[in-house]
Design a protein with these regions (language model features):
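Conserved PLP-anchoring active-site segment centered on the Schiff-base-forming lysine
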Residues: 58-114, 120-122, 304
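Generic structural signal for small/hydrophobic residues in well-ordered secondary structure
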Residues: 16, 38, 56, 72, ...
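Proline-centric
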Residues: 93, 249, 342-350
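Conserved PLP cofactor-binding pocket of PLP-dependent enzymes
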Residues: 207-220, 264, 297-341, 345
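Active-site region of PLP-dependent enzymes
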Residues: 154-160, 167-288, 321
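Short beta-strand segments
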Residues: 51, 122-124, 175, 243, ...
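Conserved PLP-binding active-site segment in aminotransferase class I/II-type PLP enzymes
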Residues: 1-63, 67, 88, 123, ...
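Active-site phosphate-binding strand-loop segment of PLP-dependent enzymes
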Residues: 101-184, 189-197
Length: 351
């Protein structure tokens, strides 16, 4: 059966043994090289990598100064990883509804959820399908809110020809977990629009330490280097950074194959009783999966599994989970989740 997800690993990892035996395994040369390569690929100036998406999320929330009692507006139609960190930090998630055709935030619903405690809008681009970028950003700007793009599944997706991360959001968060492209076995990254937030995030990622001042002229810990912000142990190690760097060299061809598969699926499904997930204007999904809307979801999934393709609904709406509290009906979420099916569209096969 053709799997829905599959970890990619380059054939050429010739320097891996040297790194393993180098004695320099913590974040260093390869970590900085990966960050520079990602900056160039995405088209941004301020980016840090982390050892997981979850770590990136916690670093981001701390850097932005979001705290217990604050509210963030988000979509429940997302990976649990995309909303769980808010609960960890005591930040109240307020669910907005989604457009049942696209699976992404409905700008009017977002607008209606804003209160005096709202600090940010968290814009998930569901399964790589890009949401209403300008409309959601406008709501954030009009109300003095941070706009955070969630690219957990959307690396390489585009809006108006620009890759996600280069659209002007205050921050964009990425996952480099095993089934993402690229993957670093596990890892993540954050892009910042603002240099000051970026500088702060470098400290927050590394226990609040300014590494340029941490050691004195005898290489002892310097008493002159104060720790002024709380932080985490979230740097990405050299092995993972090297693997990510090698994958990034192949990323365009991998994404191109996913797009070719999407074209193949569109033709293959012409006579099926399904509709494609609607692609919002001026956007290009990365086709991490190929998304359709089926009236008989269970039957459609079973049918394609019997044909050798692992179809799946992928995510359960996070509003089902009691940790986020019961906030009432979300009709767009209900309709979309009852119909959405993901079909394999990955780099490892051809339709």
């Amino acid at each position: 059966m053709e799997s829905l997800f599959k970890p990619y690993m380059p054939k050429d990892l010739s320097e891996l043994q040297d790194i393993l035996c180098s004695g320099a395994l913590a974040y260093g040369k390869w970590g900085k090289m990966l960050e520079k390569s990602l900056q160039e690929y995405i088209g941004v100036d301020y980016l840090i990598t982390t050892n997981s998406y979850n770590s990136a999320f916690l670093v981001l929330l701390t850097t932005l100064g979001l705290k217990m009692g604050d509210e963030v507006i988000a979509s429940p139609m997302a990976c649990l990883a995309s909303n769980q960190p808010f609960a960890v930090m005591g930040i109240k998630v307020i669910w907005a509804d989604i457009d049942p055709r696209t699976g992404t935030l409905d700008p009017e619903s977002v607008k209606s959820k804003i209160t005096s405690r709202t600090r940010a809008i968290f814009h998930n681009h569901f399964c790589g399908y890009v949401g209403y970028v300008d409309e959601i950003c406008a709501v954030a700007r009009e109300n003095g809110l941070y706009i955070i793009d969630d690219a957990i599944e959307a690396f390489g997706s585009k809006y108006k020809g620009c890759k996600i991360g280069a659209w002007g959001a205050d921050a964009t968060i990425y996952s480099f977990q095993t089934v993402r492209l690229p993957n670093t076995i596990d890892g993540g990254a954050i892009v910042f629009k603002d240099e000051e937030l970026y500088i702060k995030s470098v400290l927050v990622r590394d226990y609040g330490i300014d590494r340029s001042r941490f050691r004195d002229d005898m290489n002892e810990i310097s008493s002159d280097c104060d720790i002024t912000v709380p932080g985490y142990g979230a740097t990405l190690n050299e092995i993972s950074s090297y693997i990510g760097s090698q994958q990034l060299n192949q990323i365009d061809s991998l994404l191109a194959q996913q797009k070719e598969n999407a074209i193949g699926w569109k033709k293959k499904l012409e006579n099926e009783n399904v509709t494609d997930v609607v692609i919002t204007g001026n956007t290009e999904p990365n086709y991490w999966v190929y998304g359709v809307l089926a009236d008989n979801k269970r039957d459609f999934i079973n049918s394609w599994r019997k044909k050798g393709f692992y179809a799946s609904g992928v995510h359960l709406p996070n509003s089902y989970y009691s940790i986020f509290g019961n906030q009432g009906e979300l009709y767009g979420v209900n309709e979309f989740s009852s119909r959405f099916v993901a079909l394999p569209s990955g780099w490892w096969f051809k339709i």
